[in-house]
Amino acid sequence: MEAARALRLLLVVCGCLALPPLAEPVCPERCDCQHPQHLLCTNRGLRVVPKTSSLPSPHDVLTYSLGGNFITNITAFDFHRLGQLRRLDLQYNQIRSLHPKTFEKLSRLEELYLGNNLLQALAPGTLAPLRKLRILYANGNEISRLSRGSFEGLESLVKLRLDGNALGALPDAVFAPLGNLLYLHLESNRIRFLGKNAFAQLGKLRFLNLSANELQPSLRHAATFAPLRSLSSLILSANNLQHLGPRIFQHLPRLGLLSLRGNQLTHLAPEAFWGLEALRELRLEGNRLSQLPTALLEPLHSLEALDLSGNELSALHPATFGHLGRLRELSLRNNALSALSGDIFAASPALYRLDLDGNGWTCDCRLRGLKRWMGDWHSQGRLLTVFVQCRHPPALRGKYLDYLDDQQLQNGSCADPSPSASLTADRRRQPLPTAAGEEMTPPAGLAEELPPQPQLQQQGRFLAGVAWDGAARELVGNRSALRLSRRGPGLQQPSPSVAAAAGPAPQSLDLHKKPQRGRPTRADPALAEPTPTASPGSAPSPAGDPWQRATKHRLGTEHQERAAQSDGGAGLPPLVSDPCDFNKFILCNLTVEAVGADSASVRWAVREHRSPRPLGGARFRLLFDRFGQQPKFHRFVYLPESSDSATLRELRGDTPYLVCVEGVLGGRVCPVAPRDHCAGLVTLPEAGSRGGVDYQLLTLALLTVNALLVLLALAAWASRWLRRKLRARRKGGAPVHVRHMYSTRRPLRSMGTGVSADFSGFQSHRPRTTVCALSEADLIEFPCDRFMDSAGGGAGGSLRREDRLLQRFAD
């Protein structure tokens, strides 16, 4: 036995010694190979490329990541076994050179990342084997020169990044092999000169970034960008450009984004943007532009966003934006603007974002048109965040243009010291004749609002052939201006008497020129001019005189105000100019009159009051929305003046709504929500439609069902409990002698004594009836039937049963 055991031990030791050595690890050291197709060696502190000879199947590797290490050199054999590689990442290393045969075996490589290394050049032919390469990152290196052979063989390249290098120039046709290139990044280099053929053969290029370079101060050669017929984005920001020549971008018909921000542009040729019909975004912020040629933006019919912030613009011609019908965003922030014409944005109805902050606005009569335009747009709920803050004059410094009236804007700063302007003003103040031959001097407060009127040479009468229909005062928000219009289309021929009194018309005036007509607005009926009555000694004037009407209205208003001040306001309604006071004291009794399935009518009352003349009558804004909707009151309606009711339509049936009303004075509303003038309503269900869900009835039905389920559960539990009780009773109905058999109330000794005494004299030859005649003192009573089962066994059976009883009940 001992010899057998020794033999077995010897065999085991020999077998262990004969085993082959353990195989080397499959994954290269410090790398992660959890997925057989991805070899991850990023941020592992490597100084050389790991050997891939230990990989069982290196041809299966598709992605190889070596970024974030300290690799300085790439040899010719580092990737020669990775023939199926698709993506190679070598970013953020210290690679200074690439062996010419580094990528010789990587014919299927599609993405190569060489960014943020120390490469100084791309040797010709190094990238030639990469026929299927689509993405090449060589950004953040020290590449200072490029040659045409640097990109030879890269016909499939789509994106090329060369930003963050030290390139000083682009040789002609350097990108010619890249016929399918779509994205080219050349920003943050030192490029000073762009050759005429620098971008040759790049007909498919869509994105070109040349920002943060050192381009020459002027771009004059349109041939530089001529090959880029498909270019959609061109970024030339942060260069030293000072001048743009005419039609420099005329060969870019598909250009949609042009960025020239952060340059030193001081002058733009009027035709600088000629040919850019598809341009949608133009960025000119951060330059030194002091003016814009009137025709500069005329070709940009598709322009949607224009940024002119951070320049030195001091004035803009009213027709500067006249051809930008699709303009949506405009920034004039941080310029030197002091005034703008009210019609400068009239041709841009789609404008929804406008920035006018950071300018030195002078709030005088030159801003009346802009104030009128802003009031119109604010009344439509548009451009609500656009504000013009006054900087001059000192009395209005810090105030907003929206909250100023025309009297505050007429502060004497509009007078032009030039002789022509003073002459024009004097002519406006010359006595004007009425139709009856009277002469009247216009008031000083209204003289500047009217254009110079046509007059006869050395005469003070109206021009023959022109009939004036009086002055109609426009009151839109807080604007008031006199409008002189001609009655009927064209020119009306006067009566013979008027023509004779007027004399012949001068031949130098063109009578066929159509007058300019503004947009009609609703006039305030409460402030309409009274009809002048003719004096007994003068001829009747059907058309009236504009200055006479304006003077009468103004004098009447001033007389009422002076009378109110003299008698303490007795007999005159209160003068209200603040929208909050109007809501608090004048507006009252908002009630709901009628409610339908899709409409509702509300009515309110307005106490008697007076409004300042420049502000005009009070308008109303009705806010309504579904109850509990967030955000609140995103729907509202502006109502005309003198309105006391409104009907809301297109409501939703069987829905609660909250309706509020507030006053609008001079285009302003109270910043405090109108909580005191709100009413709730519930629209009726739609007729003919199926009734909606009655949630009360549904809740009651669900409660009833739940109660029934609870009752059923209780009934099931009660029935089960009763069954158990009945079973227990049935088991409790067993014979008395069985219950006494399992009773432990009496001691076993007395029970055994009685049994042994009674059964000690048992004899088998005695009749069996005597066996059943036991004494009443016995603990257990055995019925006679219990002893009948052994009768068939004869005497032997009785003896065996007796023996068992004696053994069981023995003392």
UniProtKB/Swiss-Prot annotation:
Residues 484-549 are annotated as: Disordered. It is a single-pass type I membrane protein. Highly expressed in the brain, ovary, small intestine and spleen. PROSITE patterns: LRR. InterPro entries: Cys-rich_flank_reg_C (IPR000483), Dev_Immune_Receptor (IPR050328), FN3_dom (IPR003961), Leu-rich_rpt (IPR001611), Leu-rich_rpt_typical-subtyp (IPR003591), LRR_dom_sf (IPR032675). Keywords: Glycoprotein, Immunity, Inflammatory response, Innate immunity, Leucine-rich repeat, Membrane, Phosphoprotein, Repeat, Signal, Transmembrane, Transmembrane helix. Residues 359-416 form the LRRCT domain. The gene is TRIL. Glycans are attached at N73, N209, N589. This is TLR4 interactor with leucine rich repeats. The modification Phosphoserine is found at S798. Induction: By bacterial lipopolysaccharides (LPS). The keyword Cell division does not apply. SMART domains: LRR_TYP, LRRCT. Residues 718-811 are cytoplasmic. The lineage of its organism: Eukaryota, Metazoa, Chordata, Craniata, Vertebrata.
